[in-house]
Design a protein with these regions (language model features):
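Short regulatory helix/loop adjacent to the ATP-binding pocket of P-loop NTPases
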Residues: 123-138, 153-155
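Conserved glycine(s) of the Walker
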Residues: 31
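Hydrophobic positions on the alpha1 helix immediately C-terminal to the Walker A/P-loop
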Residues: 35, 39
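Pre-Walker A adenine-sensing motif
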Residues: 2-19
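Structural recognition of the conserved hydrophobic beta-strand(s) that form the central parallel beta-sheet
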Residues: 114-120, 141
Length: 417
């Protein structure tokens, strides 16, 4: 099965021969290698590039272990270049090579080679893009399958695809399995033996139980504000473990750097400033999150919120979670100052959207809860509520856009309704 990744392929096409190193980043097993070695290579061949002018090296393979040595890898590439015609280097999982930035910088000085690399650790790569390549590194972030990509490859209708996606997520390999047990075992296996193992080895962690437990806590708390102090207290009260705030903060950073989770900052809308303390964390793939909890804690509301968050990132938006303070009456009828939560504050250039995500908004109480947050925002940027189901978008009497999840996910310009 060939899954189309047209948006990412187009990003590579428009960067071809631009004199920069194209650095494709993202969580392992999200399809970076397939994009580079299958889809992009196919495009190069169809564009008239000879096969012997495409140099392919997968550094995570045992067959290329000796090429993890920077001098040997550089010489191997030079030896493969037999003439002055253009060559295309496809280098997979570059973080396996020590001093990889020296090799790539040396290749930049060769006029007839166009370089594409993939990597699975953001800190390891992103900092070097800025400092080592001096403006000549071009990063392309790849995610697991969006729902639209998943649905296009799925053998079934929307309802079945949506149920499957909410449980097993969008890692491409999941679509290859027809049996649910295989999907579950695959996700649980790679979480432990690929992702956690990578984090432990890369950061030289000695206590695997700590990072394991931290992942479990974060998986149980997607969409809920938390911070290292709260997590530390959970360790003490439930596990009897002293786990310092600093260590927790470092370990969370390791998970973010491995693209396992994303961190959403809290933004005070009226105060126009970021506020510290409680942040929200979301999993890059909800299937991995569910696998971590052995598929017990489904929580469709929070899973749906996680999927919306990921979709917004895929579309290139900057996404924060919002708070807005306003006066409101409490249960006793007294007017008090209250803090309202806005699920997402979404920015791209001069555009801004405020988004609430509601799995079910049929009751009047739930409608009031979701809409009050939007009502108290004192500006005119677009305000939307995304609800579960297939509802077509419409505007209510207050000008808020209400749309179903299906429309949001399957229409790339859905926020422009």
């Amino acid at each position: 099965m060939e899954i189309k990744r047209d948006a990412y392929l187009e990003q590579l096409k428009i960067r071809k021969d631009n004199g920069m190193i194209k650095i494709i980043t993202g969580i392992r097993r999200c399809g970076k290698s397939f994009l580079l070695f299958v889809l992009f290579k196919k495009y190069l061949l169809e564009s008239g590039v000879d096969n012997d002018h495409i140099i392919e090296i997968a550094l995570d393979g045992i067959e290329n272990e000796e090429l993890r040595d920077p001098k040997k890898c550089y010489q191997h590439i030079k030896d493969a270049m037999k003439d002055d015609q253009k060559y295309y280097l496809l280098l997979d999982e570059v973080q396996f090579m020590s001093r990889f930035e020296e090799v790539l910088n040396s290749l930049l000085r060769i006029s007839n080679i166009d370089v594409y690399v993939t990597g699975s650790n953001s800190k390891f790569l992103s900092s070097d893009i800025v400092t080592e390549f001096r403006g000549r590194g071009d990063e392309i972030r790849i995610y697991p399958l969006s729902f639209a990509e998943f649905y296009a490859a799925f053998d079934g209708d929307y309802d079945d695809a949506w149920e499957e996606y909410m449980i097993y997520g969008g890692l491409p390999q999941v679509l290859q399995f027809s049996v649910e047990r295989q999907k579950a075992e695959y996700l649980k296996n790679i979480f432990t033996n690929v992702y956690i193992k990578d984090v432990v080895e890369r950061n030289k962690l000695r206590n695997v139980d700590e990072i394991d437990t931290l992942v479990d806590i974060l998986a149980s708390a997607i969409g809920a504000p938390t911070n290292p102090t709260k997590i530390s207290n959970t360790f003490k009260s439930e596990r009897g473990i002293n786990y310092s705030n600093k260590t927790i903060s470092n370990h969370i950073d390791y998970l973010v750097e491995a693209f396992l989770i994303s961190k959403a900052d809290r933004y005070d809308i009226k105060g126009r400033k970021y506020v510290g303390a409680n942040l929200k964390y979301y999993f890059t793939d909800v299937g991995l999150r569910n696998a971590r909890l052995n598929f017990r804690q489904q929580e469709p509301t929070h899973i749906m919120e996680n999927i919306v968050y990921n979709e917004l990132l895929i579309r290139g938006y900057n996404v924060d979670v919002g708070i807005v303070e306003a006066y409101a009456k409490n249960d006793e009828g007294k007017t008090t100052r209250k803090q309202f939560e806005v699920d997402f504050v979404v920015n791209q250039g001069s555009q801004r959207y405020y988004i609430q995500v509601a799995y079910d908004m049929t009751s009047e109480e739930k409608q009031t809860q979701e809409l009050n947050s939007l009502r108290n925002i004192p500006d005119s940027f677009k305000k939307l509520v995304i609800v579960n189901g297939t509802k077509k978008p419409w505007r209510n009497e207050e000008g808020f856009v209400i749309m179903g999840m299906k429309y949001f996910l399957l229409n790339a310009d859905s926020l422009e309704f």
